[in-house]
């Protein structure tokens, strides 16, 4: 008799995805982040569900309901901080996952990569709307500033912003719809992640060498299941330390002040994971130009397969490209730092130079370096 896991219609899918899946024998810990992102998403949906049981999406009671969760609900403080810091872990894993894809040329799987870019946008939208829900000062002003960017769209901009707001300013209607979208989007993300996995399993995983691994495959279970469990334990440990010892480390103190439309905070800034994009937005003195740069700073990822000029897939054997890749990482860290600084000298010029370098590296320098490496290797 054949094993049930190989014959049952549902078990068969799970078996072919997580048990008998042929995987390259040499994939490193950089390939752990897919499973970690799945764990993050599950954690966010579960903690979010329990928070939604006690949260009220009304401007008069939203802030109080979050306070009530932290003070009066059993382990409410834990659920709330797991959700808030879980988002930070989610983005750390996302950035490392995308960085791995860029370094090892995983973007050559076009369908998988493009779904990934859509997933990144969806997660960013979800995180932004979630940040608005506690209805603190930074929630309100962050929502006002970011939604206002759409008014830069010619002709329809103002109407579009007022349509999203549901009125003439960020108010009750805005908060209610943001809560609705924040609740539904993670389930859409889960479905997209399924499609992401579906496309990945059409081709199989890439590996550090960038070469075909068809000649040397091993079963996913037990080799990579145990490896993923180890990665998960490390991540859960890091998240636990963050939540239990310094839960407010990555948050903004201004968000403990209830939203006040009559009082603008001195420095409006988003959560740390959006700071690099915020710095690019601020570095252009024109509203529409800034918005375009902001969108393109993420959308540029979709161009990566077209900008690949090397005859090798991975950067493993390409030292010049490696140097430029790590320069890009340093540049993104610089942008993240600048995004959290006030708009004054010398931060303005540093932000502008870092923004120019960001686009120059991806669009010009890295493709040129790849061509140069082809010539050096006489390919």
From Swiss-Prot:
This is Cytochrome b. It is a multi-pass membrane protein. Signal peptide: none annotated. The gene is MT-CYB. It is found in: Mitochondrion inner membrane. A ubiquinone binds at residue 201. Heme 1 (or BL or b562) is low-potential and absorbs at about 562 nm, and heme 2 (or BH or b566) is high-potential and absorbs at about 566 nm. Its cofactor is heme b. It comes from Euroscaptor micrura (Himalayan mole). Heme b b566 binds at residues 97, 196. Its main location: mitochondrion. Belongs to the cytochrome b family. The chain crosses the membrane at residues 33-53, 77-98, 113-133, 178-198, 226-246, 288-308, 320-340, 347-367.
